[in-house]
Amino acid sequence: GAFIMPGTLWCGAGNAASDYSQLGTEKDTDMCCRDHDHCENWISALEYKHGMRNYYPSTISHCDCDNQFRSCLMKLKDGTADYVGQTYFNVLKIPCFELEEGEGCVDWNFWLECTESKIMPVAKLVSAAPYQAQAETQSGEGR
């Protein structure tokens, strides 16, 4: 199956929850992931949406969702939250997107060449801002 962070049901590829209310033992971190999974504006892997094809192996989200996700995890000042944040933003470096007025394709021919485009909100990729670990180290100092 897909990789899900131990102690969570929503952190990782897909989710392992049977319904929205179900959370893992790392409840606070899991809530951040669940909220991010329910972001309104996203483009799944290889999907064409907002005038752009997502060539990443995972879903990319609107930057508002990724910024909320980062803040949610950082507020917890917790090792598990830091691990999830560092994996998503620093290791996988999953970008987010902003929408800008631009020209997007709306119709293609058999060879996948654009035959009709129009002015519409078009997705522009934004590099993931780094995640700063927030948990206290064993000596009591921040990392």
UniProtKB/Swiss-Prot annotation:
Domain of life (superkingdom): Eukaryota
Tagged with keyword Secreted: yes
Catalytic-site annotation from UniProt: 36
Keywords: Calcium, Disulfide bond, Hydrolase, Lipid degradation, Lipid metabolism, Metal-binding, Secreted
Tissue expression notes: Expressed by the venom gland.
Alphabetical list of InterPro entries matching this protein: PLipase_A2_dom, PLipase_A2_dom_sf, PLipase_A2_His_AS
Top enzyme category: hydrolase
The protein's required cofactors: Ca(2+)
UniProt-annotated binding residues for Ca(2+): 10, 12, 14, 37
Locations listed in the record: Secreted
Keyword Manganese in record: no
UniProt function note: PLA2 catalyzes the calcium-dependent hydrolysis of the 2-acyl groups in 3-sn-phosphoglycerides.
Name under which the protein is recorded: Phospholipase A2 isozymes PA3A/PA3B/PA5
Organism for this UniProt entry: Heloderma suspectum (Gila monster)
